[in-house]
């Protein structure tokens, strides 16, 4: 069965974080992802 063409309906954004080890980069990224998912109706993936 052939797959249908994927239509990207939302803009794609790459975000980079730079910082020292154990200074909260992952925590900050997870918080931003969760807040934006709630605000714009998306789904945050772990």
UniProtKB/Swiss-Prot annotation:
Its main location: cytoplasm. GO terms for molecular function: GTP binding; GTPase activity; translation elongation factor activity. Residues 1-10 have a biased composition (Basic and acidic residues). It is found in: Cytoplasm. Signal peptide: none annotated. The keyword Nucleotide-binding applies. The keyword GTP-binding applies. GTP binds at residues 19-26. Keywords: Cytoplasm, Elongation factor, GTP-binding, Nucleotide-binding, Protein biosynthesis. Pfam families: GTP_EFTU. It comes from the Bacteria. Residues 1-20 are annotated as: Disordered. One of its GO terms (cellular component) is cytoplasm. Gene3D superfamilies: P-loop containing nucleotide triphosphate hydrolases. Monomer. This protein promotes the GTP-dependent binding of aminoacyl-tRNA to the A-site of ribosomes during protein biosynthesis. Belongs to the GTP-binding elongation factor family. EF-Tu/EF-1A subfamily. This is Elongation factor Tu. The gene is tufA.
């Amino acid at each position: 069965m052939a797959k249908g063409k994927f239509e990207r309906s939302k803009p794609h954004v790459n975000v980079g974080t730079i910082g020292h080890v154990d200074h909260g980069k992952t925590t900050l990224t997870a918080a931003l992802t969760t807040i934006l998912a709630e605000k714009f109706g998306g789904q945050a993936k772990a």
